[in-house]
């Protein structure tokens, strides 16, 4: 069961068959993410494969990981399976049970 962890807090956890892996990034279904640790960011980027990405700051115990998570609300057709799914980076570790 993959989970995203930052500063000792589990941010997301889902069954292996529920996550999506695209270009090496593990995308979690939105209902598997603890949104209490996410704060909307104004950052937007464009990926040629997936389209526009919107970001969240990850906030744990007043520590902020700026733009530490992102999602594609309306991805391009090649990546439509990740619409709304959330992935992490910038020190957020993805752990896997054996």
List each model region and its residues:
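Terminal leader/tail segments of proteins
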Residues: 1-98
